[in-house]
Curated annotation (Swiss-Prot):
Plastid is among the record's keywords: yes
One Pfam family named in its UniProt record: RuBisCO_large
Compartment annotation: Plastid, Chloroplast
EC number: 4.1.1.39
The protein's name in its UniProt record: Ribulose bisphosphate carboxylase large chain
Cofactor, how bound (note): Binds 1 Mg(2+) ion per subunit.
C-alpha cells in the first residue's frame, strides 16, 4: 500500500497484548505515571516504541528493515495497587537490539531516551529479566563468592570491613597506620572511602604503598589474610588501569571502583583486568540515590545491582536493612539474593518482577555499611547469613580506646553471633543477650556496647518529594 508520510500511531505497532515472550527477550517492568489525560495504554506503548525502534513520524527507511523483528513490544499493563494513576507496563525487547557484553549499550537502549518523554509524568524501571543467552556474553564478577573465600581462606562467617575515616585530610603514613590497627585488631578488610582518589595531601601511589605495608605487617602478626580496598577510580580509564597495575605489583589482594560515577565501560574494563590478574574487585555505589531514591521515577537499585553483576564486581554496597522499615527488609533481601544466588524465583512481595536465571555466573557479596555498630551484629548475621561483608566505619574507629580495640570488639561480637547461631539460638530474639554474654570476656566489646547502647537511626523512608 506504499509509503504514507505522517505522524505515527504507536498503538498499532507497539501494543501487543497477545505477544508470547521469548526466552531470549529482555523483559522490563516499568512503573509509568502518565500525564493527566493520557490513557495508560498510550503511555505503555510509547515507552516500548521510544526505547526501541520508534521515532515520532513515519520514515521511508522503515521499509528497509523488519520492524516486527526489531521492535520493543508493550505486552501487558496493570494498575499499581494502592496508587492513583500509576501503571506497570511490561515491555519485551528482542535480543538483537543489544550489543554483546555491553551493559552500557543495554542501558542506553532501555533507559537512554525515554525518561524525558513528554506524555509521561514520571517513569521508573523497576526490574529487568536478563535472558541467559545475553548473560553468557558477559564475564561477570572477576572471581565471585566461592573463589574469594578460597583466596582468603575464610569460611562459615560474614567478612568484616571498616572504612577509614576521616576520609579526607590524613597523610598517607597516618592513613596506613589506621589501616594496620584495624586489620591487626581482627578485621578482614579496610576500605578507601568512595571519594578517596588522589589529592595534594595524599597521592594515590603513596597511599597504596603505606596500605600494602600495613596489610603485610598485620598478616604477619595475625596469621590471617588481610586486604584493603584500594580505590582505583580516576579521571580516565588509562589512569584507573595504571593504579590497578600498581596494586597488583604490590601483591595486594583487592582493589575498588565507584561503578556509577566511573561508568559501566570503565567498570567492565577493570573487572576484566581483575580476573586476568587475580585481583578481587570491591564496588561502591556512589551516586545510586540520584537514580534510585524516587519511588516513581528513575531506576530501582535492583536493576543497578543486576547490571553490576553482569559488568563485574566481587562486592557491592547494598544497604543495611537494620533499623529500617520491615517492608524494605524484604525488598533489600530480594536484590541481595539477585546478587548472590544462581536462580531467583519471581516474587512480587520481594520486588522481584521476573524469575532470573544467572546460569552459574559468579555471585557478588553484598556489603552492609552505614551507621551500624556492635549492637546490630545479631540482626546483621541473621538477615544476611554468611555471605556478606559487614562494614563498620564509625562503628570501629569510634571506639573510645581506639581503632584496634574497636576492631576487636566487632570481631568478638561477630564470632559470638555466629557461634550462637550455629548452636541453634534465635538471634532475632536473643541477640542482645548473646552480645551481653560476650562482653563478660571481652573488655573491648564491653566498652563498645557502653558507647553505642542507645544509638538508633530510625526515620521513615523518604522516597517521594
Amino acid at each position: 500500500d506504499g509509503f504514507k508520510a505522517g505522524v505515527k500511531d504507536y498503538r498499532l505497532t507497539y501494543y501487543t497484548p497477545e505477544y508470547q515472550t521469548k526466552d531470549t527477550d529482555i523483559l522490563a517492568a516499568f512503573r509509568v505515571t502518565p500525564q493527566p489525560g493520557v490513557p495508560p495504554e498510550e503511555a505503555g506503548w510509547a515507552v516500548a516504541a521510544e526505547s526501541s525502534t520508534g521515532t515520532w513520524t513515519t520514515v521511508w527507511t522503515d521499509g528497509l528493515t523488519s520492524l516486527d523483528r526489531y521492535k520493543g513490544r508493550c505486552c501487558d499493563i496493570e494498575p499499581v495497587p494502592g496508587e492513583d494513576n500509576q501503571y506497570f507496563a511490561y515491555v519485551a525487547y528482542p535480543l538483537d537490539l543489544f550489543e554483546e557484553g555491553s551493559v552500557t549499550n543495554m542501558f542506553t537502549s532501555i533507559v537512554g531516551n525515554v525518561f524525558g518523554f513528554k506524555a509521561l509524568r514520571a517513569l521508573r524501571l523497576e526490574d529487568l529479566r536478563i535472558p541467559t543467552a545475553y548473560i553468557q556474553t558477559f564475564q561477570g564478577p572477576p572471581h565471585g563468592i566461592q573463589v574469594e573465600r578460597d583466596k582468603l581462606n575464610k569460611y562459615g562467617r560474614p567478612l568484616l570491613g571498616c572504612t577509614i575515616k576521616p576520609k579526607l585530610g590524613l597523610s598517607a603514613k597516618n592513613y596506613g597506620r589506621a589501616v594496620y590497627e584495624c586489620l591487626r585488631g581482627g578485621l578482614d578488610f579496610t576500605k578507601d572511602d568512595e571519594n578517596v582518589n588522589s589529592r595534594a595531601f595524599m597521592r594515590w601511589r603513596d597511599r597504596f604503598v603505606f596500605c600494602a605495608e600495613a596489610i603485610y605487617k598485620a598478616q604477619a602478626e595475625t596469621g590471617e589474610i588481610k586486604g584493603h580496598y584500594l580505590n582505583a577510580t580516576s579521571g580516565t580509564c588509562e589512569e584507573m588501569i595504571k593504579r590497578a597495575v600498581f596494586a597488583r605489583e604490590l601483591g595486594v589482594p583487592i582493589v575498588m571502583h565507584d561503578y556509577l560515577t566511573g561508568g559501566f565501560t570503565a567498570n567492565t574494563t577493570l573487572a576484566h583486568y581483575c580476573r586476568d590478574n587475580g585481583l578481587l574487585l570491591h564496588i561502591h555505589r556512589a551516586m545510586h540515590a540520584v537514580i534510585d531514591r524516587q519511588k516513581n521515577h528513575g531506576m530501582h537499585f535492583r536493576v543497578l545491582a543486576k547490571a553490576l553483576r553482569m559488568s563485574g564486581g566481587d562486592h557491592i554496597h547494598a544497604g543495611t536493612v537494620v533499623g529500617k522499615l520491615e517492608g524494605e527488609r524484604e525488598i533489600t533481601l530480594g536484590f541481595v539474593d539477585l546478587l548472590r544466588d544462581d536462580f531467583i524465583e519471581k516474587d512480587r512481595s520481594r520486588g522481584i518482577y521476573f524469575t532470573q536465571d544467572w546460569v552459574s555466573m559468579p555471585g557478588v557479596l553484598p556489603v552492609a555499611s552505614g551507621g551500624i555498630h556492635v549492637w546490630h551484629m545479631p540482626a546483621l548475621t541473621e538477615i544476611f547469613g554468611d555471605d556478606a561483608v559487614l562494614q563498620f566505619g564509625g562503628g570501629t574507629l569510634g571506639h573510645p580506646w581506639g581503632n584496634a580495640p574497636g576492631a576487636v570488639a566487632n570481631r568478638v561480637a561477630l564470632e559470638a553471633c555466629v557461634q550462637a547461631r550455629n548452636e541453634g539460638r534465635d538471634l532475632a530474639r536473643e541477640g542482645n543477650e548473646v552480645i551481653r554474654e560476650a562482653c563478660k570476656w571481652s573488655p573491648e566489646l564491653a566498652a563498645a556496647c557502653e558507647v553505642w547502647k542507645e544509638i538508633k537511626f530510625e526515620f521513615a523512608t523518604v522516597d517521594t518529594l
